[in-house]
């Protein structure tokens, strides 16, 4: 294919990715909000399009599509654009919309937006000082300076999510961790909730009755006769006010208890549904996956520990290494190079699809959890920043899963980064995240029955 035809193919694919990002923005993130800033929508869609294009170019590297020079050009162009968006455009607009929400700074929002962006750039640049992420010969304006710093943030984010996911996935899927919940437990808790609601209604009726009596009494004594009449009205209303305050305090405490009882009741219903679901064929399948992921989690933690202790980074991609070990052990004739290419392609494809799907699901949940009509623009831009850094760092790590002959152009485009550092850093953060998640889930699982008994 000629360079022009290759470029047309890349532009068409980028337009498709842009359209998908636009639809995701409209139908998932902003479907419940009327006010939309089109610049936010464009920035999010552009970030999504160029992030997906990097994964597309990885697939093209393995399949050998497009000319080598075309792939190199589009790798370079794509990387420059995504870095420009992540380092300059998105941080500036985040500061701009933050300042726009502050009325006192509304007239000088451009000045304060630039100030926020310069502050971001200072800390972003200082981020590279403590890490051995660059070769000493790179200049201060080289593209490697930006990639290296974006990679540190992205790899840290990936490792945190991977560590928590490796622990939370088996905990969620396995029926072993489900506590036993009966209909009697649910009915008892619902009865307590109804009793609490009745007490709240009763006390609020008392408050309304006391206020009505105070209002009627106030009309009768609206014109107290003389000095002693005023003293009498003040002294008689003081105990009533104290009584009202005490009843209101009791109502507040009961409402807090009702919220806890409601959440606990909803949790028991969800657990009961999970128990029933675990008895179905699909539930048993996910239970099996839970055991598989448990083994995977233990293996990943073990290998991360080994890599950290012995300062070890694999030189061969995992697929080729695994096939070589199997072939040598069984002593059979096998074309390792041919099959490692195809299996690596399938593996990388699975990693790419699951990464994009998982990140989009996580972004949607996160957005609905913390967004509001005023903060939604800022939240979307933050998600675009996280998404772009996540995908750039994914390329740094996926590179190790590819056979050596497919890494050439990617390595040339990314520059002489210290790739081994990123893999070691991933192992360190993954280990910390996984162990912290195990401790957190253990405490939460242990506390749940105690909380249920207390309620």
UniProtKB/Swiss-Prot annotation:
Keyword check for Zinc: no
Coiled coil: none
One GO molecular-function entry: voltage-gated monoatomic anion channel activity
Keywords: Glycoprotein, Golgi apparatus, Ion channel, Ion transport, Membrane, Protein transport, Transmembrane, Transmembrane helix, Transport, Voltage-gated channel
InterPro entries: ABA_GPCR_dom, Golgi_pH-regulator_cons_dom, GPHR/GTG
Reactions catalysed: iodide(out) = iodide(in); chloride(in) = chloride(out); bromide(in) = bromide(out); fluoride(in) = fluoride(out)
Sugar-modified residues: 67, 180
Main location (coarse class): Golgi
Superkingdom in the source lineage: Eukaryota
Signal sequence bounds: none
Any one GO CC term of the record: Golgi cisterna membrane
Entry function: Voltage-gated channel that enables the transfer of anions such as iodide, chloride, bromide and fluoride which may function in counter-ion conductance and participates in Golgi acidification.
Protein name in the entry: Golgi pH regulator
């Amino acid at each position: 294919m000629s360079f022009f035809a290759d470029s047309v193919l890349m532009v068409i694919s980028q337009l498709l990715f842009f359209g998908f990002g636009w639809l995701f923005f409209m139908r998932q993130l902003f479907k419940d909000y009327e006010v939309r800033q089109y610049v936010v929508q464009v920035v999010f869609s552009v970030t999504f399009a160029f992030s997906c294009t990097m994964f597309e170019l990885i697939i093209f590297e393995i399949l050998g599509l497009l000319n080598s020079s075309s792939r190199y050009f589009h790798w370079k162009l794509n990387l420059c654009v995504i870095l420009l968006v992540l380092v300059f455009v998105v941080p500036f607009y985040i500061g701009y919309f933050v300042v726009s929400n502050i009325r006192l700074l509304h007239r000088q929002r451009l000045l304060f937006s630039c100030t926020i962006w310069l502050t971001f750039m200072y800390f972003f640049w200082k981020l590279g000082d403590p890490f051995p992420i660059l070769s000493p010969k790179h200049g201060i304006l080289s593209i490697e300076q930006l990639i290296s710093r974006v990679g540190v943030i992205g790899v840290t984010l990936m490792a945190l999510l991977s560590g928590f996911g490796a622990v939370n996935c088996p905990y969620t899927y396995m029926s072993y961790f489900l506590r036993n919940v009966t209909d009697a437990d649910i009915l008892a808790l619902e009865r307590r909730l109804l009793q609490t609601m009745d007490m709240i209604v009763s006390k609020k009726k008392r408050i309304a009755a006391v206020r009505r009596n105070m209002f009627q009494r106030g009309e009768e004594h609206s014109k107290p006769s003389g000095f002693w009449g005023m003293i009498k009205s003040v002294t008689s209303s003081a105990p009533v006010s104290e009584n009202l305050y005490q009843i209101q305090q009791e109502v507040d405490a009961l409402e807090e208890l009702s919220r806890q009882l409601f959440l606990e009741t909803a949790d028991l219903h969800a657990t009961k549904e999970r128990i029933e679901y675990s008895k179905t064929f699909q539930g048993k399948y996910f239970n099996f996956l839970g055991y598989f992921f448990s083994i995977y989690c233990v293996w990943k933690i073990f290998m991360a520990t080994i890599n950290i202790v012995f300062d070890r980074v694999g030189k061969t991609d995992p697929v080729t290494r695994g096939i070589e070990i199997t072939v040598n052990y069984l002593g059979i004739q096998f074309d390792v190079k041919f099959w490692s290419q195809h299996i690596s392609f399938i593996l990388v494809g699975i990693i790419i699809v699951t990464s994009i799907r998982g990140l989009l699901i996580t972004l949607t949940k996160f957005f609905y959890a913390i967004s509001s009509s005023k903060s939604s623009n800022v939240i979307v831009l933050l998600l675009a920043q996280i998404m772009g850094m996540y995908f750039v760092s994914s390329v740094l790590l996926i590179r190790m899963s590819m056979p050596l002959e497919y890494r050439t152009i990617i390595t040339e485009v990314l520059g002489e980064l210290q790739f081994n550092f990123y893999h070691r850093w991933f192992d360190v953060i993954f280990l910390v995240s996984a162990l912290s998640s195990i401790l957190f889930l253990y405490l939460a699982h242990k506390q749940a029955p105690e909380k249920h008994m207390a309620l």
